[in-house]
Amino acid sequence: MSHEKNEASGYPEAQSWKSQEAMLGARTEVSRWRAVKNCLYRHLVKVLGEDWIFLLLLGALMALVSWAMDFIGSRGLRFYKYLFALVEGNIGLQYLVWVCYPLALILFSSLFCQIVSPQAVGSGIPELKTIIRGAVLHEYLTLRTFVAKTVGLTVALSAGFPLGKEGPFVHIASICATLLNQLLCFISGRREEPYYLRADILTVGCALGISCCFGTPLAGVLFSIEVTCSHFGVRSYWRGFLGGAFSAFIFRVLSVWVKDTVTLTALFKTNFRGDIPFDLQEMPAFAIIGIASGFFGALFVYLNRQIIVFMRKKNFVTKILKKQRLIYPAVVTFVLATLRFPPGVGQFFGAGLMPRETINSLFDNYTWTKTIDPRGLGNSAQWFIPHLNIFIVMALYFVMHFWMAALAVTMPVPCGAFVPVFNLGAVLGRFVGELMALLFPDGLVSNGNLYHILPGEYAVIGAAAMTGAVTHAVSTAVICFELTGQISHVLPMMVAVILANMVAQGLQPSLYDSIIQIKKLPYLPELSWSSANKYNIQVGDIMVRDVTSIASTSTYGDLLHVLRQTKLKFFPFVDTPDTNTLLGSIDRTEVEGLLQRRISAYRRQPAAAAEADEEGRNGETGASFTGEAESSFAYIDQEDAEGQQREGLEAVKVQTEDPRPPSPVPAEEPTQTSGIYQKKQKGTGQVASRFEEMLTLEEIYRWEQREKNVVVNFETCRIDQSPFQLVEGTSLQKTHTLFSLLGLDRAYVTSMGKLVGVVALAEIQAAIEGSYQKGFRLPPPLASFRDVKHARNSGRTATSNSSGK
């Protein structure tokens, strides 16, 4: 019947079939698009996880940041000179502009870093060295530090002071590498890399920082290896070169785009002769530059350290400077700006030149001792002072900028020492070159050929040698020939740099290692070949035997006691205190989390409700107790506001954040409970107030004591089941190698699976450096005891063997 009805009615049935087919087709089309979309998304996620995508993104980003920083800094210096020229003729206004402009910028940079991220102050390379070696330094690789470092460094460079960009920019590049890696991990859904891959990422970031700072991709990789790593993975070579080359290319292209340069050239382009760049007779002069640079580089590190140590001493001046953080940079800026005032004392040592202008003038092809009219020399004319010898001007520049640079880099702003030291080395080399040109005015004759002396070549070699002496790196020679485009001078550069390193390493540590020692950062000293007595030391001689551990049978009270007594970040996890078999390692935060989940106001809610049900309290009793409890809580909260420390979980927080000893108030007093303070501190009182009011203070105290006696269930926390282990007989040399390669900060010492001690960076450092008494280095006492015992045993063995024969 219905079929006939459909036939009589015409097309409704066909129309319904068409609509169903259309809907089915639409669904099919949507499913196809979804499949294509999912495929593209998976492909995109896979591509974003590739190393080369990460390197290209990081290289482009760092090139853009470096170019923007240079662009803003150059415009700031140009505006500085414009203001100074605007008030020409009025000495008072000129002095005011010359001093106030850098003063405002330095104070802004210092204040901005102090507010946003104090970790942004300084170079950043010493901290990176310790992070790459396995130490954990908080807030050094965060977005806040990146913002503070970038803004502070840009503003500080605009002041025209002897401050460098290289160190802070290496830190900036490492932060960018870390943040970009986290972003790509989040997008692609993969977990963050373990330590050894994170170290590779930081190393690549350091290489990119050097590459796009100077436009030197080869030197960027080599310098990052020398300065930041004790061991470098070969797998990271191509990453460093790819990212460095791409970032340097983008950095130079951006300079051409804004018409700062005509084409892709070296940053400090030179035009020395290329057919025969130097003569063999000049090698002694190059060697003298290297040796002198070694002495002056060590002196620079020593002077810088003495300034920092003096500022850290407790006296009246340092107390004022610590309370008012802006006084020190203000005083230093005022003194340096006053001494560098061009119409004043600054006119006698070329203080009117900015850092880049100074380098360009020192690298020119002119011989200043032969110049009669300096007006055609451009910026080099600043070195010519009427009635004053050019050698005196260069000597004054070297002496004044030597201590000025050592003082300026101690200011609490993002700054490095590479460029100031580079300038000092260039002046030293130029001084020797001009002296050679004066001694041999007609040049040097060799095999019938005449070679003219170019002092600019000596300046380049001096710059490489001085920076190598301060940083203890040989790759500064590669930086210099990439900066200047003069690869033909590699041999004399290498000779001078190696000699400078030999002298400087025998006198002082590098500038970065010196800062590490001053800041007492965790680091691992190098184990030199000459330390033969160190190879007789074993782990059993230097390990800490009194180890605080957590057993699988521990109670919550035991955990609280452990957190109170120690400030360790990790605890060894053993089966029982008697057998002491090592099962793993537990993070301190995991232990705190266990206590927090067990002894807290939220945990008391069901306990209070259950106890109320068991005792059958009525509303009248509860209401009468409520007012009583509120008054008691108000009194205890008032005591807590006065800063008294509480037992329980509050003691955990106090011991974690403040290492002071616990309060001498007896723990038996009911008011000394942690849950009450947690109610005020964490804001849980509003949620749990109805249940809390059902318990008296004595009941809360008894409940907490009962909970502390409960055995901990460690299944709810993360335990590292494979902590690094050593045996007592492991040599110090092998331990040092393992710590360096794997970036360890501690290792547990076991014997047949039993925990017998722990060795950390501090013990290895003390063993390598040793203790000094009247010039003699003493080995650890246990090592001497073991050697004597070994000698006795060997003597007995020899006696028995001889008697057997």
Curated annotation (Swiss-Prot):
Cytoplasmic topological segments: 1-48, 508-805
Residue spans that sit within the membrane without traversing it, per the record: 125-132, 201-213, 217-225, 456-470, 471-472, 473-484, 485-489
Renumbered ranges of motif Selectivity filter part_2: 164-168
Keywords of the record: CBS domain, Chloride, Chloride channel, Glycoprotein, Ion channel, Ion transport, Membrane, Repeat, Transmembrane, Transmembrane helix, Transport, Voltage-gated channel
Occurrences of domain CBS (ranges): 543-601, 719-776
Gene3D superfamilies documented for this protein: CBS-domain, Clc chloride channel
The keyword Membrane appears for this protein: yes
GO cellular component: chloride channel complex; plasma membrane
Transmembrane stretches, start-end: 49-86, 93-116, 141-159, 166-184, 237-256, 283-311, 320-339, 388-408, 416-439, 490-507
Membrane topology: Multi-pass membrane protein
Glycosylation-annotated residues: N365
Motif (Selectivity filter part_3): 416-420
Residues where chloride binds: S123, F418, Y512
InterPro entries: CBS_dom, CBS_dom_sf, Cl-channel_core, Cl_channel-0, Cl_channel_volt-gated, ClC
Stretch list, region Disordered: 606-625, 653-684
Location relative to the cell: Membrane
Motif (Selectivity filter part_1): 122-126
MF annotations from Gene Ontology: voltage-gated chloride channel activity
Family note: Belongs to the chloride channel (TC 2.A.49) family. ClC-0 subfamily.
Task performed by this protein: Voltage-gated chloride channel. This channel is thought to ensure the high conductance of the non-innervated membrane of the electrocyte necessary for efficient current generation caused by sodium influx through the acetylcholine receptor at the innervated membrane.
Other noteworthy facts: The CLC channel family contains both chloride channels and proton-coupled anion transporters that exchange chloride or another anion for protons. The absence of conserved gating glutamate residues is typical for family members that function as channels.
Subunit-structure text: Homodimer. Each subunit contains a channel ('Double barreled channel').
Protein name according to UniProt: Chloride channel protein
